[in-house]
Amino acid sequence: MREEALQAIQEAPDLPALQAVKTRYLGKSGLVTRELGALGKLPPEERKRRGAELNALRQAIDAALTEREAVLKRAALDARLASEAIDVTLPGLSLPAGGLHPISRVYDDLIRIFERMGYAVVEGPEVEDEHHNFEALNVPWYHPARDLQDTFWLEDGRLLRTHTSPMQVRYMVDHEPPLKVVVRGKVYRYEATDATHESMFHQLEGLVVGDGISMADLKGTVAELARGLYGPSAKVRFQPSYYPFVEPGADFAVWWDNPRGESKWLELGGCGMVHPNVFRAVDDLREAAGKPRVYEGKTGFAFGLGPERIAMLKYGIPDIRYFYANDPRVIGQFRGELG
């Protein structure tokens, strides 16, 4: 039986076959188990001798089973590793890469420029009241911007802000001069949508207030902005313009070489010295809130520009509507670009 059992163990091709051999010899009804159960029927001397033989046989079978099991497990593992082996020379599976929206990229570029100049960066509410959006910014009731055809009005008398300037008022109410701040966010205009106009777009607006702030400071700031966007040799032009919340007001443009080899002045935004009526309105709001009047007699400048226009020119996007169409063919071109 010993030779038969050991041979069967060595010839077992896999673990299930080895388990069958174990059951055949050492199971509850196995050959060795039955022999051990029959020892009680033998005379004492023969029982002792036969018992020693069967115990030695069982130990030999157990040892052979353990050794063969280790061999078969190792062989099974080797076979599995061979079948599941990774060829490290094959190219990996690339995961889809995300990227910043072009508007976000331009915003980040602008914010970095102003943070280098020491500006705080804030955002404000998109739903505004009429006073902060118009009256506090020296936009009287008869001004065309307050026409129902130009503004999204809500049923409760509030509106979707038409510019980010209301946050300038809110910031001055909460902070005393001197201050330097830029405001970023969405604004809304009730106008027809076309390649260059949307009813929702973005603005970045800046405000500086202190003692002796002049138009020269404003020009220096805009020039630094232009250099940050278009390089150290960027040229800036100012032209007189009208905005109710600044006096004097101006539009600013940079000399731009487009990808087609053309050079021209590119208008970026508007700016000017903060109108005294705005400072007066801010102090009125501060006084109503129990705060001291600190802005009358101060000077400051403000400026604003649209990230969409910069992004359209920078990336050659011909239609502003592409930014918000959720077209993967457009946005997918910016995968992996994280600023």
From Swiss-Prot:
Keywords: Aminoacyl-tRNA synthetase, ATP-binding, Cytoplasm, Ligase, Magnesium, Metal-binding, Nucleotide-binding, Protein biosynthesis. It catalyses: tRNA(Phe) + L-phenylalanine + ATP = L-phenylalanyl-tRNA(Phe) + AMP + diphosphate + H(+). It holds the Pfam family Phe_tRNA-synt_N. It comes from the Bacteria. One of its GO terms (molecular function) is phenylalanine-tRNA ligase activity. GO terms for cellular component: cytoplasm. Binds 2 magnesium ions per tetramer. Mg(2+) binds at E247. GO terms for biological process: phenylalanyl-tRNA aminoacylation. It is found in: Cytoplasm. HAMAP family: Phe_tRNA_synth_alpha1 (MF_00281). Tetramer of two alpha and two beta subunits. This is Phenylalanine--tRNA ligase alpha subunit. The gene is pheS.
